[in-house]
């Protein structure tokens, strides 16, 4: 009776389930837990493991990429330093070649200037000699004509005329040199 009374009291309490309901609920929970544990939980664990592996792989890959990027950066810096060194060397060579070229061009200009001056002096000397020769002939002709008029005889003989002119001009040159 006590059990009946307890059962009657229990029926009255809605918070305490009846034993058959409790057993059925526990069995259903165990079946659902077993099915979830055998079927769903391995899939969830598999997905979580794949995600963890992907994250770790991503981290490892990021670390490897960081190391590779650092290596590439060092190579870039080394190449940049080498390029700067090469540019400085080429600039120095260009300056040296430019200085050499300027020196050569100055020497060539000096040589050409000397040649032009020498040619000018030679031309002046040739012109002076030609002018002196022309003057000598003109003075000789005038002197012969004047001498012929003074002497009263013709100095038409060419050989005689040349001798007289030469003597006259030689005398003038001697006087000119004596006055200097």
From Swiss-Prot:
Topology class, membrane: Single-pass membrane protein
Keyword list, A-Z: ATP synthesis, Cell membrane, CF(0), Hydrogen ion transport, Ion transport, Membrane, Transmembrane, Transmembrane helix, Transport
Annotated GO MF terms: proton-transporting ATP synthase activity, rotational mechanism; proton-transporting ATPase activity, rotational mechanism
UniProt keyword annotation of NAD present: no
The keyword Cell division is assigned to this record: no
Localization terms from the record: Cell membrane
Transmembrane segments: 15-35
GO CC, any one term: proton-transporting ATP synthase complex
Stated family: Belongs to the ATPase B chain family.
Task of the protein: F(1)F(0) ATP synthase produces ATP from ADP in the presence of a proton or sodium gradient. F-type ATPases consist of two structural domains, F(1) containing the extramembraneous catalytic core and F(0) containing the membrane proton channel, linked together by a central stalk and a peripheral stalk. During catalysis, ATP synthesis in the catalytic domain of F(1) is coupled via a rotary mechanism of the central stalk subunits to proton translocation.
Record-linked PANTHER family: ATP SYNTHASE SUBUNIT B, ATP SYNTHASE SUBUNIT B', CHLOROPLASTIC
Assembly and binders: F-type ATPases have 2 components, F(1) - the catalytic core - and F(0) - the membrane proton channel. F(1) has five subunits: alpha(3), beta(3), gamma(1), delta(1), epsilon(1). F(0) has three main subunits: a(1), b(2) and c(10-14). The alpha and beta chains form an alternating ring which encloses part of the gamma chain. F(1) is attached to F(0) by a central stalk formed by the gamma and epsilon chains, while a peripheral stalk is formed by the delta and b chains.
Name of the protein this chain belongs to: ATP synthase subunit b
Organism: Streptomyces avermitilis (strain ATCC 31267 / DSM 46492 / JCM 5070 / NBRC 14893 / NCIMB 12804 / NRRL 8165 / MA-4680)
């Amino acid at each position: 009776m006590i059990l009946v009374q307890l059962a009657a009291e229990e029926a009255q309490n809605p918070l305490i389930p009846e034993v058959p309901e409790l057993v059925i609920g526990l069995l259903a929970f165990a079946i659902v837990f077993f099915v979830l544990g055998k079927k769903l939980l391995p899939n969830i664990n598999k997905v979580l493991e794949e995600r963890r592996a992907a994250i770790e792989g991503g981290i490892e890959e990021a670390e490897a990429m960081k190391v590779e990027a650092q290596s590439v950066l060092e190579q870039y810096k080394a190449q940049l330093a080498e390029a700067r060194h090469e540019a400085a060397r080429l600039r120095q060579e260009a300056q040296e070649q430019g200085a050499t070229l300027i020196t050569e061009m100055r020497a060539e200009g000096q040589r050409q200037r000397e040649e032009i001056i020498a040619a000018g002096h030679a031309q002046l000397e040739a012109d002076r000699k030609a002018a002196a020769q022309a003057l000598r002939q003109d003075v000789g002709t005038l002197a012969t004509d004047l001498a012929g008029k003074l002497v009263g005889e013709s100095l038409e003989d060419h050989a005689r005329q040349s001798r007289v002119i030469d003597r006259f001009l030689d005398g003038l040159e001697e006087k000119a040199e004596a006055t200097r």
